[in-house]
Amino acid sequence: MKQKKSVKEEDKTPVVLVVDDNQENLELLQAYLEDVDCETVAAHDGLEALRIIERRAPDLILLDVMMPKMSGFEVCKKVKNDPQTSDVPIIMVTALNEFGDIERGIDSGTDDFISKPVNKLELLTRVKTMLKLKHLTDKLERTLAYLSEIEKQTQMAKSD
């Protein structure tokens, strides 16, 4: 179960899960992400990615599509259908760029696409944008929960 942070809790370094069965691609993406203030975690296939996500939901997932054991489409669908992880943004990083592939990715729940070969500036721009959106969304959720609690306390005080 996800633990809610308090409104005033200090922001922690975001975690980016990079999933690719090709070691060179994995290392390249991790090297590019050194320019972003984040911690990277690597997975070599979809099943390994799901095990990592189950232990600790990342703030962002960079997900290859064509992998053994479980495709990126399947991983994406599982992550997005789980209430504990449905808000984790996913960027599919793929050589597949036909309209049908993009449509399938959207149907599986992906938030964005980057085509291979990856352009470093494009990757960094999209990653930073997704992390910022995730940070602001999480902060908004904490603030709303905090305000809801204050409202409950106010209502209880009025009824006393």
What are these regions (language model features)?
Residues M1-L17, L147-I150, T154, K158-D160:
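Non-catalytic signal-transmission and effector/linker regions of two-component phosphorelay proteins
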Residues K8, V15, Q23-V41, R51, ...:
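Two-component/phosphorelay signaling modules centered on CheY-like receiver
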Residues R56-L62:
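Active-site beta3 strand of CheY-like receiver
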Residues M67, V79:
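Receiver (REC) domain active-site loop signature in two-component systems and cognate sites
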Residues V118-V127, L131, H135:
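C-terminal output helix
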